[in-house]
A protein has these predicted regions:
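Positions within the helices of HEAT/ARM-like alpha-solenoid repeats
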Residues: 45-50, 64, 78-85, 118-125, ...
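Long amphipathic alpha-helical scaffold regions
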Residues: 77-94, 153-185, 211-219
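Amphipathic alpha-helical scaffolding segments comprising HEAT/armadillo-like alpha-solenoid repeats
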Residues: 24-41, 62-74, 96-115, 124, ...
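Bacterial N-terminal signal peptides
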Residues: 5-16
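Sec/Tat signal peptide C-region and signal peptidase I cleavage site
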Residues: 17-21
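Alpha-helical, heptad-rich or low-complexity scaffold/stalk segments
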Residues: 37-93, 121, 158, 215, ...
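Core register positions within helices of long alpha-helical scaffolds
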Residues: 25, 56-59, 85-93, 126-132, ...
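N-terminal secretory signal peptides that target proteins for export/translocation
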Residues: 1-3
Length: 219
């Protein structure tokens, strides 16, 4: 009970003054209470408890995901195991067959959490979760993170693993004045996604390309 109350207090502290989630679940709990109850039961004792808790947490949507992500502390303090367990479980639950209706809101929560997070290691963890559930509509949002030295690799992996990102990748590749690093990232994405339609663009980059860029293009 003490743990639950501590978590609930921390969640309330994260909310703007006077703001509370209004939607109630079947047990008449708001999102803050659902999250506090769920976190207090983790790690789950059985698969049945895991599925029940993750189902309830996933049903809180973007609000719940943002609350849990907002409790992450700088990764070097090593106090994030339960929170990461919860976020990973929510993502897994929302992407499981039959739970697709939950995925969009979970994805939205991860996007907002990444935008608000200031710790690189935590941003990377959140991005790794987004990579598991991102949709084509997220491609334009993900693309600028190719310029983030810490998250660039996570961003390109997300663009590769997400179905339907091909138009955004091609549009980016057609821009003038792309840096060599951006060309290498795009060439890698084209290869991983087997995008033969990008071959004319890649061949056009070979003229004047540095050795690393040329090697990536040929790969």
């Amino acid at each position: 009970i003490i743990t639950r109350l501590f978590i609930l207090g921390a969640l309330i502290a994260l909310l703007p003054a006077g703001v509370a989630a209004q939607q109630l679940d079947a047990r008449q709990r708001n999102a803050e209470t659902v999250v506090a109850d769920g976190l207090a039961q983790l790690p789950a004792a059985t698969p049945a408890v895991f599925n029940e808790v993750m189902g309830e947490l996933a049903a809180t949507g973007s609000a719940g995901v943002e609350m849990i992500a907002g409790m992450l502390t700088p990764a070097d303090k090593g106090k994030n195991a339960t929170l990461e367990y919860a976020l990973n479980g929510i993502t897994a639950y929302a992407t499981a067959p039959g739970n697709e209706a939950l995925c969009a809101d979970v994805r939205k929560g991860l996007v907002r959490a990444i935008e608000r997070c200031a710790d690189n290691a935590n941003r990377a963890f959140l991005f790794s979760q987004l990579q598991l559930c991102s949709a084509a509509e997220d491609a334009a949002w993900i693309l600028p993170y190719l310029d983030d030295s810490y998250l660039a690799d996570y961003a390109i992996r997300a663009l590769i693993s997400t179905p339907g990102t091909e138009p955004v990748l091609l549009a980016e590749a057609r821009k003038e004045g792309l840096a060599a690093e951006r060309k290498r990232a795009l060439a890698y994405a084209f290869a991983e996604k087997r995008m033969t339609q990008a071959e004319p663009l890649l061949l056009g980059w070979l003229g004047g390309a540095d050795a690393r860029t040329a090697e990536q293009i040929y790969n």
